[in-house]
Amino acid sequence: MDRLRSHKAIFLLLLPVLVGCSIGDVRRPPPDRSSASPRPAPTVPTPSRAVGFDEVRHVRVAVDRRYDRPFVEFVDADHGYALFAACDGVPPGRGCTALLYATVDGGRSWQALRHPRPVAEDQQLYAVPGALVLLAEPYGWYTSTDGGASFVHTTGGEPAALVAARGRFQVAEGVGAVAEWDGAALRPLPAQPAVPGLNTVGHSGDLVVAAGARDGRPSAAVSRDAGRHWVSTPLPWRGDDVGVLRAVIAPDAGAWLVGERPDRTGFPALWRLVGGREWALVRAVGHPAQARSVAPLGAELVAVTSPDGVGVVAGGRYYRVDWPLTGEHHLTVLGDGTILARGPDDVVVGTGWTANRRWVRVVLAGG
């Protein structure tokens, strides 16, 4: 009876995005992969019909047309940054300096910021809660905690703001151990989980999940007391190889494991933590052979983009959904639960809860 109620609840969550679907939908063919290594054959593509955005925010700023498309990153649904960092494919120079912009209204408007090192061999932008971090090689890092009004310059390893953004518990690089960030350094915990090939940590409150894969076999351990004690938690496994295992905490604090395939393109294995100590293998009957991105949304739902389009795993099945996204969009979930979908030509922001979203296409251009 409980399972029946759960399936009914999941169906009600999905109903608003399923009502527009039809069995005869025609989908765009997958991109040409002839130059890549052999991969599993995808399901026969038949694309989804065009679905409109709820809003399009297309803004032009005073940037010379020689500049390439900017890199745009959002911290939450409202706050984002954009970096124009090349002209005609060439890194910024004296005649093409890096340009920095910020938005505080979800991309409706953009304000120019002073870039602290506009000429460099390579430019990168990282936007995390509470900080904007720029990397201008070979000069180092520039960190702002006031929305880009001022920057602090550092060299060497990643600045504290970037490390802190990964969470209180992390895997210490080069050590292969679960470590705790104390505000200044990552310090390995006295008690360590027995996880072969440890490579990922996720946490919510005092719950800490550590996982990894070795020789294709996934394994995990769980701590309920902030890493002081660990319990090995066997994973139901069907023998299909896992290349990289990722721990993901959904917006509702649910813990998931995503088992990426060795070729990084095959549809991944999925597990959900049940009762705090047991992993349930999540089935996805009808899923495509490949996946570009996977993002747990909460309420036992997982969003997927693939060469076949966009879908959601729910109640043991894979459902195609009427979202205005393509298989080229890569999904991430921001700290406020917003879905960020990055495509080759745009960034799409999806606000709302679970599968019911308001989709806004954000386009920033010069000229």
Segments predicted by a language model, with ranges:
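Blade-level signature of beta-propeller repeat domains, shared across WD40, Kelch, NHL, RCC1
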Residues: 333-367
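N-terminal low-complexity, Pro/Thr-rich disordered segments
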Residues: 22-64, 231, 359-367
